[in-house]
């Protein structure tokens, strides 16, 4: 069965429920078709994912679609680019996503939480600007990232080997980075919110000066950053929640032991872990504890 997707219509209706008959809406000159026809095995998997979750997994799409957002300035100053994936590689990437992403959530939750559009790429890259004092100008380069989200879409990078050939550490690193981007996107869309008890513990009006002060105040490192975010003047509830979520998917229970010696960190950890399980059905400790063979 061929499912006709009008991407512009999807974008216009992105706030609507996923059971809307998007496939029946035609926009001349802007139609995507599932299956996309690049690889039969990948197309079969993608149709099954559509039937299961109501999301459109696309491996052929335009740069305009990649950068499209309904929310102005949602990227801030960040600039991203992508390299398209060869259709024959899509099945392997879907195998990896099943292992490191979908397997950790209930089908019902993902049907609600997954973005409408999931762009499958060879590589997603972030533009890095570094000031060179010698030439008194910025030098631009590109940094590979595992994923990038905008409102109701996420773009995901491929790996350069089969899932079977990936080491346990490679799978874990991929899982941790992808999960942190996914969860951050859910915070941005208010699909996941922190409970009031979590927010009430830390004082967001007082800056901290070092790591010790940060832990005593109940703030943890965000492992996706190379600096202590809470001493950088970014004391917001969302940054706090994102730091805990990223730490939870990056770290095992053993790796949490030192931070949990701080009373406020322990309180917030326990509150958030319990809240995610009862409110969303997410066993986030299991995600962090998963070590592959």
List where the protein language model places each region:
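Positively charged n-region of N-terminal signal peptides that target proteins for export
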Residues: 1-5
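C-terminal motif of bacterial Sec signal peptides marking the signal peptidase cleavage site
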Residues: 12-15
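Acidic/polar, low-complexity intrinsically disordered N-terminal segments immediately downstream
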Residues: 17-108, 251-293
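Auxiliary, metal-adjacent structural segments of Zn-dependent hydrolase domains
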Residues: 91-151
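Structural recognition of the beta-strand scaffold that forms the well-ordered cores
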Residues: 119-120, 153-157, 242-246
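Structured domain cores in non-transmembrane regions
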Residues: 127-172, 270-273, 277-290
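Active-site recognition of the HExxH zinc-binding catalytic motif
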Residues: 150-200
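Metalloprotease/metallohydrolase-associated module, dominated by Zn2+-dependent proteases
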Residues: 202-293
């Amino acid at each position: 069965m061929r499912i006709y997707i009008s991407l512009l219509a999807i974008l216009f209706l992105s706030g609507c429920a996923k059971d809307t008959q998007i496939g029946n809406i035609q926009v001349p000159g802007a139609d995507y078709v599932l299956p996309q026809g690049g690889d039969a095995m990948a197309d079969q998997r993608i149709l099954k994912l559509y039937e299961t979750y109501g999301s459109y997994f696309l491996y052929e799409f335009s740069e305009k679609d990649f950068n499209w957002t309904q929310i102005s300035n949602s990227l801030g100053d960040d600039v991203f680019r992508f390299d398209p994936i060869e259709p024959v590689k899509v099945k392997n990437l879907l195998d990896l996503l099943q292992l490191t992403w979908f397997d950790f959530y209930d089908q019902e939750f993902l049907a609600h939480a997954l973005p409408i559009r999931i762009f499958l790429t060879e590589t997603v890259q972030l533009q890095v600007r570094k000031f060179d004092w010698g030439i008194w100008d910025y030098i631009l380069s590109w940094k590979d990232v595992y994923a990038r989200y905008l409102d109701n879409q996420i773009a995901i990078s491929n790996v350069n080997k089969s899932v079977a050939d990936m080491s346990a550490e490679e799978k874990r690193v991929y899982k941790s980075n992808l999960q942190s981007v996914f969860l951050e996107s859910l915070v941005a869309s208010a699909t996941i919110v922190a409970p009031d008890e979590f927010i009430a513990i830390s004082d967001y009006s007082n800056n901290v000066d070092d790591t010790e002060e940060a832990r005593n105040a109940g703030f943890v490192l965000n492992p996706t950053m190379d600096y202590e975010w809470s001493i950088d003047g970014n004391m917001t509830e969302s940054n706090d929640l994102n730091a805990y979520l990223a730490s939870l998917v990056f770290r095992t229970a053993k790796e949490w032991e030192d931070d949990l010696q701080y009373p406020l960190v322990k309180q917030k950890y326990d509150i958030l872990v319990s809240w995610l399980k009862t409110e969303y059905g997410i066993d986030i400790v299991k995600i962090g504890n998963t070590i592959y063979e």
